Amino acid sequence: MKTKHTIPIILSAFLLSCTGKTNGQSQQSVEKTLTVEQAATAKKQRLAPPPGYKKVKLTEGTFGSFLRNLPLKPVGSDLHYYNGSIKRRNYTGAVVDIDFGHGEVEQCADAVIYLRALWLWQTKQYDKIHFNFTNGFRADYTRWAKGERIHIDKKTWRCWYSKDTAADYSYKTFRKYLNLVFTYAGTASLEKELTTITGKELQVGDVIINGGHPGHTVIVVDKAVNKKGEAVYLLAQGYTPAQEIEIFNQWFSINPQIKYLDTPDWYFRGNYAKRF
């Protein structure tokens, strides 16, 4: 497995970055193929909120709306690791059909970074696309798009910019910028960039994170409430080994003031609720 670089922290730490709750606790594979009728029913029911709950209204064009409307692979699609091997057959949640999860360094924090950065790039909010490496160096997309490139001395881990090429705001160049961020950022650095949520409710786009080595993170991609005002949330994640982005097939009741949250692959503790 290719090692993600944490600067100047031990480089191999990211091999443990999202490897919680294993030892047989992962969702079991469903070894069957859905019929056309079953697939149609499953598509209608997939990701539907629990009885008595309705999805909250989201303004078109917002980050929340972007996350709610992520393109999904067909019902019953397999969930794949970055190398093409199958993690879960006929995944009962949803597999996001997006340009992520095909590179070895595209892990849990990177999934959150990618979704946030992609929305900002699509809405041309280029100046807001910036992420820190683990040593605190700020990688600015605007400088990258203008032709500057980031250089790293791997003996001292000093980073600097230099003007190396012409300006280019294309997706190809944007993706190359993200590949570098994925290599040198992680849950430890991402957590420091986010604001702690002090209230009792989350918004779509909020992040659940325990930064560290190991660490893990998931992102809120939808929200529903009942007549009592009680909220439930839909969560998505990347993982280690790198994989496609998955949306869990369950809604979570989350109160950030309760300092413990159990998800299928990770127990979050402390001030885990954050916001961009």
Name every feature range the model reports, one short phrase each.
Residues D168-K228:
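...with weaker cross-activation on analogous glycine-rich loops/strands in unrelated enzymes
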Residues L16-S17:
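C-terminal motif of bacterial Sec signal peptides marking the signal peptidase cleavage site
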Residues D97, H102-T195:
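Extracellular-facing segments of soluble proteins and assemblies that are Gly/Ser/Thr-biased and enriched
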Residues N226-Q237:
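Short, solvent-exposed secondary-structure boundary/capping segments
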Residues G238-F276:
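Low-complexity, Gly/Ser/Thr/Pro-rich intrinsically disordered linker/tail segments
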Residues K2-I10:
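Sec-dependent signal peptide recognition
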Residues N23-D99, E106:
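Cationic-aromatic interfacial patches
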Residues G211-G212, Q237-Y239:
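Conserved "cap/hinge" positions at secondary-structure junctions
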